[in-house]
Structures are given as C-alpha cells and as structure tokens.
Amino acid sequence: MSKLNAYFGEYGGQFVPQILVPALDQLEQEFIKAQADESFKQEFKELLQEYAGRPTALTKTRNIVKNTRTKLYLKREDLLHGGAHKTNQVLGQALLAKRMGKKEIIAETGAGQHGVATALACALLDLKCRVYMGAKDVERQSPNVFRMKLMGAEVIPVHSGSATLKDACNEALRDWSANYSKAHYLLGTAAGPHPFPTIVREFQRMIGEETKQQMLAKEGRLPDAVIACVGGGSNAIGMFADFIDEKNVKLIGVEPAGKGIETGEHGAPLKHGKTGIFFGMKAPLMQNSDGQIEESYSISAGLDFPSVGPQHAHLLAICRAKYASATDDEALDAFKLLCKKEGIIPALESSHALAHALKLAYEDPNKEQLLVVNLSGRGDKDIFTVHDILKEKGEI
C-alpha cells in the first residue's frame, strides 16, 4: 500500500482519536488513486475551468507602486467563482468524497469563505452540507452565512471556547468522529491531521503553476518573490508549491500581527509561537506558559487561527521561506490603497500580503524587482467591517 509522507521535517503527523484513523487511511488511499486516475484529473480540471473560471488573471498594477522601480503583479484568486482561492481545493475534495461514496460533507469556517465554497460545491455535486462556525464569526460575517443557507447548507453556530474558528474546528472533528462512515470532513486549509495538508496543497497548487507560466509569458523570467498571507496557509502553499525548487524565487508568507506583536493580540504562531499538538497535527501554536492555546486575533476572520500548516513550519525551519507579519493598520492601509489606486477591493486577509509587498517596494524605491502578491480573495465580505472601523476613526 503506497503512502504519502505524514511529516514535513518534524511537523505534521496524525494526532487523532483511534476511531478516525481508518477514515484518514481511506482518504489517503483514495487520494493517491485519484491522483493517478486521468478521468478524475480531467473532471477536476473541467470544473475549475468551466465552473470556477480558471485560469485566473495575473494583473500588473498600474498605479500603486508607480514611484518605484518595482513591478507588482497580483494573482487574481479574487476573480474565482465564490470570491476566493477556497473554491479550488473544495471542488477537489468534494469530488474525492463522491469517489469514496460519501453523501454528506462536514466543514468548518472562519470568515465564511470556506463555508461558502463548500456550500457551492455541495450544491453542484448534490451532497448534503453542514458547516460549523464560531458564534462570533456568525455575527461578523452575516452575508456569508446567508450565502451558505441560500445554497442549501446547514450553518451550526459554535458557542464554546472563544466561539471562533478553533472551536468550530473542534466541533467539526467531533461530528466527523461520530459520522465518518457516511460523511467526509472537508477541511478548509493546509493544516490538520495527515493527509489533509498534502491534499489541500495539491488541490491548490495550480495557483503557483499558472503564476509561473503567466510570469514567463509576460516578463520572460520568474519573479524575485511571491508573497501570500498565512492563516492556516492554503493560499500561500498553493502559490509556493511550484516555486519551492526555484531557489532564486523568494517565498514570503505574511502572518497577521493584529494590534502589534508586542500586545499579544495577533495571529503569528510561526514567528512567535511554540511547537505543540493542535487540530490533529504537530505545529507552531500560540500558547501560554501552561501550554494552553492562546486566543489568536486579527482584523480578518480568515487569519484568526492560533496555528499554521506544517509545511510552512518546515519551510521556515529549513530557511526556504521567510515569514513576515503585517498589523491590522498596515493591512487596512493596503486595502484602502488598492481600492483607490487600482479599483480592486481585496479581502482583508490578502491585504496583509499586499501591505508587505508595498513595504518592499517603498523601502528601496530604486531597487528593480518583480513581485507577485497572491490576491487570495475579494473584499465584499469585509466592507461592513472596514466601514465601521473608518467611521470610528472619523475617516468617513
């Protein structure tokens, strides 16, 4: 029986109740078979093209870095059906679930983007869908909650713990433990127990593959750096995967620094956490001196996650990728700038990556460089949040 690597260096693994091991083994075997099955790959490719709208554009910005010698491109995952990169891997996993004969899908969601993507895939492929969502997130992401319901999903608010994403993850795993024979747990990021980090990466890697081809066509060379925001890390690993062996391309992940790293109110476990076991994996984790999980914080619900995917931890450990952070205010400034200068409303998550790219462009305006930001999602879901913050600041 062929097996995938369960670890990335020391990170990853499969720390789950014994009852779930057969379900994870089945998932791994079916994934390996599906990857070797031309008809599965063809169906996935067709859904991505005909339904989701791939390939997405690689847009050269016109105005935002005008006074520098930086060329800044945006990989437009915001243009994907569903509004974010999430749709890619959800279609892949939903097809995999059908292949395994599962009729129900369980998912968790933070910002609601993964929930919406799961709901649309389930509607399309005729699967029953239930989504766990922290009660706090249900409040702050009401448009996405309604979208999920419109597409036939059952949305279950989670009131335990901090009533955010980590609690929704725990409830979803609990449900799966009870129902794995008929339900597939459609995990929303490149984290969690093996084989999820690998499956999600492979179902997102077209982001980097397309970027590479588009870049060569437009500029005749690869970029100096690709930059992506990191919560759990799926959009970033999708962008990085095809560039890992291209040693001249810097991989830069941007974690949320929230109100500032020094305040403790952030979501940057890669640089400021300690290794622990959470959500079925060994990974960097925000924890206090007693080893209890600390609350993560970010202006963007989708980055508000106290851990990170194991491959990112490994890429940092071997110095292949670099991880920076951007504060709420920096992300907000980048958000406003992209709206005003380019006519694109980005997700607050993606705005963290953009903020770091702008920092690179402006700290040395005379440096010639070619940068790509993965614009992982559109900002429609965030306009009410931004409106309230700007109102509070007296800017509108």
From Swiss-Prot:
Cofactors named for this entry: pyridoxal 5'-phosphate
EC number: 4.2.1.20
SUPFAM superfamilies in UniProt: Tryptophan synthase beta subunit-like PLP-dependent enzymes
Alphabetized Pfam families for the sequence: PALP
Entries under CDD domains matching the protein: Trp-synth_B
Keyword Electron transport in record: no
PROSITE patterns the record matches: TRP_SYNTHASE_BETA
Catalytic activity, reaction form: (1S,2R)-1-C-(indol-3-yl)glycerol 3-phosphate + L-serine = D-glyceraldehyde 3-phosphate + L-tryptophan + H2O
Record keyword Lyase present: yes
Any one annotated GO CC term: cytoplasm
Keywords: Amino-acid biosynthesis, Aromatic amino acid biosynthesis, Lyase, Pyridoxal phosphate, Tryptophan biosynthesis
Protein family: Belongs to the TrpB family.
Name of this chain's protein: Tryptophan synthase beta chain
Provenance organism: Francisella tularensis subsp. tularensis (strain WY96-3418)
